[in-house]
């Protein structure tokens, strides 16, 4: 049986990231925002326990625009989680970031505004969090340092543009997104990242580039291509996250834990 007080790290991923044969402890958490994507799982990394959640549900049955992001993040907060690693499949908008690349993005452009429930503060209290730097600087530092030490090549700076989906983009949309500064594209980082900031959870992303986006790829885009590339990269991503978790200091020294300070009237 786990000690809830000792589980401080969460991982949000898709199918395939958590496939160990060890018996897992299943945690069901109820929230005022409805049901999370699925029950949480307690995983063990050496002697460190982490709380894992499959963003799209146990059988990848929830499309990006239907994920209950508020319930998912609330569940982590309710459990006492202080840091979250988000894992993503993305498309590349530039030939400088080829399929198979592992990216630690540092910026976000959100094209889901107004389409998804994106805040915990809709009534009684108005909160405006500082989202200048959308990812935890401390986790990013340890991800990049760990990648260098264990010999995993990562791209250290990239802007992730989040779209609503579930359809893939047109070639004209991709050209536009590239022109406004996006490097990789996906459908799930928002409002996940900003909700984590609203509850003062540190959050960082590890993105796998599954394919070139529309108009850049010379071939039709397929889900099979995404799945195959993700499967090829999961070992490296899992190893990077596990080794990073082992190096994180117990006490957080970033600004994320004070995100609500001076954020409301």
Curated annotation (Swiss-Prot):
Its EC number is 2.4.2.44. Phosphate binds at residues 15, 55-56, 188. InterPro entries: MTAP, Nucleoside_phosphorylase_d, Nucleoside_phosphorylase_sf. It catalyses: S-methyl-5'-thioinosine + phosphate = 5-(methylsulfanyl)-alpha-D-ribose 1-phosphate + hypoxanthine. GO terms for cellular component: cytosol. The record marks 169, 223 as: Important for substrate specificity. Catalyzes the reversible phosphorylation of S-methyl-5'-thioinosine (MTI) to hypoxanthine and 5-methylthioribose-1-phosphate. Involved in the breakdown of S-methyl-5'-thioadenosine (MTA), a major by-product of polyamine biosynthesis. Catabolism of (MTA) occurs via deamination to MTI and phosphorolysis to hypoxanthine. This is Probable S-methyl-5'-thioinosine phosphorylase. It comes from Thermodesulfovibrio yellowstonii (strain ATCC 51303 / DSM 11347 / YP87). The lineage of its organism: Bacteria, Pseudomonadati, Nitrospirota, Thermodesulfovibrionia, Thermodesulfovibrionales.
């Amino acid at each position: 049986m786990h000690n809830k007080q000792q589980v401080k790290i969460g991982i949000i991923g898709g199918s395939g990231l958590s496939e160990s044969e060890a018996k897992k402890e299943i945690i069901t958490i109820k929230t005022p925002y409805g049901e999370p994507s699925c029950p949480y799982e307690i995983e063990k990394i050496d002697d460190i326990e982490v709380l894992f959640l499959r963003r799209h549900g146990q059988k990848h049955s929830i499309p990006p625009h239907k994920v209950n992001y508020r319930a998912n993040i609330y569940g982590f907060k309710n459990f006492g989680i202080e840091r979250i690693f988000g894992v993503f499949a993305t498309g590349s908008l530039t030939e400088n970031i080829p399929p198979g690349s592992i990216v630690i993005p540092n910026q976000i452009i959100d094209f889901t505004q107004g389409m998804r429930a994106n805040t915990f503060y809709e009534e009684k209290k108005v909160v405006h969090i500082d989202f200048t730097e959308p990812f935890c600087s401390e986790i990013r530092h340890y991800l990049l340092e760990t990648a260098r030490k264990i010999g995993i090549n990562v791209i250290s700076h990239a802007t992730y543009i989040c779209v609503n989906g579930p359809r893939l983009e047109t070639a004209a949309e991709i050209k536009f997104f590239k022109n406004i500064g996006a490097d990789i594209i996906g459908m799930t980082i928002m409002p996940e990242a900003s909700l984590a900031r609203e509850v003062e959870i540190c959050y960082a992303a590890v993105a796998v580039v599954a394919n070139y986006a529309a108009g850049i790829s010379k071939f039709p885009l397929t889900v099979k291509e995404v799945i195959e590339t993700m499967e090829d990269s999961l070992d490296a991503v899992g190893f990077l996250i596990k080794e990073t978790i082992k190096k994180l200091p117990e006490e957080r020294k970033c600004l994320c834990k004070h995100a609500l300070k001076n954020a409301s009237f």
